[in-house]
Amino acid sequence: MRNIIVKELNQTYIEDIDIEIVERKGIGHPDSISDGIGETVSEALCKMYMDELGGVLHHNTDEVQITAGESNPVFGGGKILKPIDILLTGRGVSEYDGIKFPLDRVAIEAAKNFLDDTIINLDVELDTVVECKIGHGSGDLVDVFKREGAPSSNDTSFGVGYAPFSETETLVKATEELLNSKPFKAKHPAVGEDIKVMGLREGEKITLTIGCAMVSKFVANREEYIAVREELKDIVSDLATKYTNREVEVFVNTADNDDATDESGYYLTVTGTSAEMGDDGSVGRGNRANGLITPCRPMSMEASSGKNPINHVGKIYNILSNEIAKDVVENVEGIKQMNVMILSQIGKPIDQPKAASTQVILEDGVKLEDVDKKVEQIVDRWLEDISIITENVVQGKTRTF
């Protein structure tokens, strides 16, 4: 019998609170690059182990550190003066049952492939130095994956999720995803991948402040830069009408000095990421598992990216909590909003958490007894089928940042 708790949440519905703040760090932000590398390396190790053994050995690659390089962007060109240093750390298994694995090579290759796919104007071989210092784990750590039934939790920890997204949350995420989409880059090559979107809702007005690294070789002069910046404002303003009827005001690169006639007054980069010139990055300092940073919502400080998808509850429970919340809100009538918190105990099966706590805001006229059994059933089903989370992560079907 699982300890599933359903309680009514005595809290104002997200759309009715006076102030809401939402942030998303885009795929080219140094923290997001770190998240992406950590997760991609984990996926590559999973594939390596699966191909050889049919199962996944212990690993965690959630300790990626980016130390920024140096660059000299100029209108119409520029160059990298010092490459970006990327350090891969964590733990993995390089030998098991007489089989040796090329752990470091696979990790470095995965990191470089991610950079190639993600930062279009980055020359990975010339402009980055990728170093692997992933430690080699002991056989004792591997044993946990060989037990019968659900894997045992590797830690006493918790995961948090909620649903549905608010209008502001949806708009913030959609804005970054549009600006960093492949079709958009093809039409607007001057727009780099290092994009941060900060959303503020004050009552019925939403303000979006966007920091966007411009790629210097595609911007010939000050006038072209300003034209691209102003076009971005118009594009995002048009996008906003698809997600909200509220007033939306858009700002882009507010630190620019339009009185400057040279590059010094503008957000120019050679590669499209600030990691080239002074902005460091680490796993877990950016987006949560749902892709957002949401101080007005319950959040876990746990970094999901790079953690092993077999029994690391810091990853599994954060993803699972969001899936449960979405499922309940979409399929149980009468629930306006839901929070989910799942707590593990180290050594206990991950499908038997110490507590699976849910909190619901109900529609007017709906009572808790009208929905609690349905909520319990959905939570129980997800815990019973928790391996789906692992399978989706291993196959790269689930985003963790």
UniProtKB/Swiss-Prot annotation:
Entry EC no(s): 2.5.1.6
Cofactor: Mg(2+)
Ranges annotated as spanning the membrane: none
Alphabetized Gene3D superfamilies for the sequence: 3.30.300.10, S-adenosylmethionine synthetase, C-terminal domain (3.30.300.280)
UniProt signal peptide: none
Recorded metabolic or biological pathway in which this protein acts: Amino-acid biosynthesis; S-adenosyl-L-methionine biosynthesis; S-adenosyl-L-methionine from L-methionine: step 1/1
GO molecular function, one term: magnesium ion binding
Keywords: ATP-binding, Magnesium, Nucleotide-binding, One-carbon metabolism, Transferase
Binding residues annotated for ATP, in chain numbering: 135-140
Superkingdom of the organism of origin: Archaea
Family named by the database record: Belongs to the AdoMet synthase 2 family.
Main function: Catalyzes the formation of S-adenosylmethionine from methionine and ATP.
Designated name of the protein: S-adenosylmethionine synthase
Organism encoding this protein: Methanobrevibacter smithii (strain ATCC 35061 / DSM 861 / OCM 144 / PS)
